[in-house]
Structures are given as structure tokens and as C-alpha cells.
From Swiss-Prot:
Enzyme class: lyase
Protein name: 4-hydroxy-tetrahydrodipicolinate synthase
GO terms, molecular function: 4-hydroxy-tetrahydrodipicolinate synthase activity
Part of a proton relay during catalysis, annotated site positions: 54, 117
Organism: Mycobacterium leprae (strain TN)
Reaction catalyzed: L-aspartate 4-semialdehyde + pyruvate = (2S,4S)-4-hydroxy-2,3,4,5-tetrahydrodipicolinate + H2O + H(+)
Annotated pyruvate binding sites: 55, 211
Length: 300
């Protein structure tokens, strides 16, 4: 059994928002909006933010833009929340360069996605994640999301990677609770729910928290859910989980980027529109989203 000698909840947080990247009307990164949003999320209960992930539209942002966003958010909230930099790509050499650059800017940790599009074998995944983890002293979270990468990180590969001292956890977005529970027991890796619809089930099998999209709109409720579960008040945790369910339905319809940006605008926080090929919500979609947000008590 491998035991990860790193206090992940204390060092990386338990409620992390996979933060959108705000854009100006001309499509450039809106640093002022990023500062406002980061402060709002931390004030609402998030103890960590993940930048330049799926919801951050990382395939459409340059490395310079990723580093610009990282600097701005670190300056805004880095003294009171953990700031995790998304630093993965389908190119190992590029990922290594980005990891080093993010570490140089002061990131508190790294989220590294499974290489997508090229469908590498498990031996390639092991070599990729090892090369990235070797390139830094920062804690690394693996991001297992085969719905987007096609290839999963198989359980045996995760177990092998757990022996690396810098690989401390997994953002799990493939709904394999059984394997995740066994891996946590076998390795000591920390697991985060990467699927808001499964946040409570993941806690039940041992996950330490969430890397959430709906926390853009409901961070306070998710913090209450975590607190209730941690204190043994499962009834309250279940009630909160059901209450915020409409936001998960909205995300399924619209996608995380479109839902988050439209929902924030409804709450009075303008972070701009997505970059192509993502699309802003239509008027009809915004009306439907507003119904879901009211049902979840996150919009008056």
C-alpha cells in the first residue's frame, strides 16, 4: 500500500471551483472581472480555485493568457485560498513547459488532464504523468475525464502513479465510485468529485471534496453540504444535494461553460461570453436557466 504523505485537504482545499475564464467584449482575458469573481467565490465559501481547466476554456487560451490569469487570481485571493493551475495538454513536452511556468508564477498546485485526442496507451499515460510530476515540486492532481479525453486512466495506472511523491490526488469525472473507493483505500490518494451530480455519493465512498462547476452559483450551499456531511448530519446533506439538483440539470443541457457564464450574469456578475467553438446561451436558454436557478434558491 502506498500512503501519500501530504495533507491534501489542508494544502489544496475541499471546495474548489473550476473557474471560468472571464473575457472582455473583444475576446481578451478580463483581468478585472477575474479578480471580482475570484473574490466572490472565496467569500462564498470556496477554499480553492482551479484555473484553466475544462470550464476555464483551456483549449482556447494561450499559455501567456493562462499565466496572466494565474498571476491575477493569485494576487487577488492567493493569501486566503489555494490556487490550482490547469497545466495539462495532449503534448507531454508542452505540459512540462507549462507546469514549470505555473510553478514559477507561484501556483499552489497543478491539475493535469489525461492527454486527449491522441488516445495514448496506459504506458504512455504513465510516462506522461510521471514526466510532468518530475518537472515540479508542486502537488499534482490527475484529472481523469474519459468523456472528453476518450482514454481513461485505468485503476492500475493510477495505483502505479500514486508512488510518485508529487502525485497526491485525482479529480474523478468518470463516475467509477467502486474503483475510486478501492484506490483511495489502497494508495491514500485524495479524491475530488469532478461531477457535481455525484458530489454526495463521492463523499460517501471517501472523497475529500469537490472540484465543482455549479459552485459558481451555489458555493454557499456546497460548503453547507460538506459541513453537514463532515459532522454526520447526512439528512441535511441529502436535502442540500436534492435542492441544488436543478443546477446539475441545467449544466447537462447547456454545458459547464455556457451555464456558468450565463448564470453568473443572472446573478449580476458579468464574465463575458465563451470563446468559439463554445456559444453563449440563447434568450430561451437563459429563461430556462433562471427557472432552474430559482428552484435551487440561487436566484430571486
Amino acid at each position: 500500500m502506498t500512503t501519500v504523505g501530504f495533507d491534501v485537504p489542508a494544502r489544496l482545499g475541499t471546495l474548489l471551483t473550476a473557474m471560468v475564464t472571464p473575457f472582455d467584449a473583444d475576446g481578451s482575458v478580463d483581468t478585472a472581472a477575474a479578480t471580482r469573481l475570484a473574490n466572490r467565490l472565496v467569500d462564498a465559501g470556496c477554499d480553492g480555485l482551479v484555473l484553466s481547466g475544462t470550464t476555464g476554456e483551456s483549449p482556447t487560451t494561450t499559455d501567456d493568457e493562462k499565466l496572466q490569469l494565474l498571476r491575477v487570481v493569485l494576487e487577488a485571493v492567493g493569501d486566503r485560498a489555494r490556487v490550482i493551475a490547469g497545466a495539462g495538454s495532449y503534448d507531454t513536452a508542452h505540459s512540462v513547459r507549462l507546469v514549470k511556468a505555473c510553478a514559477g508564477e507561484g501556483a499552489h498546485g497543478l491539475l493535469v488532464v489525461t492527454p486527449y485526442y491522441s488516445k495514448p496507451p496506459q504506458t504512455g499515460l504513465f510516462a506522461h504523468f510521471t514526466a510532468v510530476a518530475d518537472a515540479t515540486e508542486l502537488p499534482v492532481l490527475l484529472y481523469d475525464i474519459p468523456g472528453r479525453s476518450v482514454v481513461p486512466i485505468e485503476p492500475d495506472t493510477i495505483r502505479a502513479l500514486a508512488s510518485h511523491p508529487n502525485i497526491v490526488g485525482v479529480k474523478e469525472a468518470k463516475a467509477d465510485l467502486y474503483s475510486g473507493a478501492r484506490i483511495m483505500a489502497d494508495t491514500g490518494l485524495a479524491y475530488y468529485s469532478g461531477d457535481d451530480a455525484l458530489n454526495l455519493p463521492w463523499l460517501a465512498v471517501g472523497a475529500i471534496g469537490f472540484i465543482s462547476v455549479i459552485s459558481h452559483l451555489a458555493a454557499g450551499q456546497l460548503r453547507e453540504l460538506l459541513s453537514a456531511f463532515g459532522s454526520g448530519d447526512i439528512t441535511t446533506a441529502r436535502k442540500i444535494n436534492v435542492a441544488i439538483g436543478p443546477l446539475c440539470s441545467a449544466m447537462d443541457r447547456l454545458g459547464g461553460v455556457t451555464m456558468s457564464k450565463a448564470g453568473l450574469r443572472l446573478q449580476g456578475i458579468d464574465v463575458g461570453d465563451p470563446r468559439l467553438p463554445q456559444m453563449p446561451a440563447t434568450a430561451e436558454q437563459i429563461d430556462e436557466l433562471a427557472v432552474d436557478m430559482r428552484a435551487a434558491s440561487v436566484l430571486r
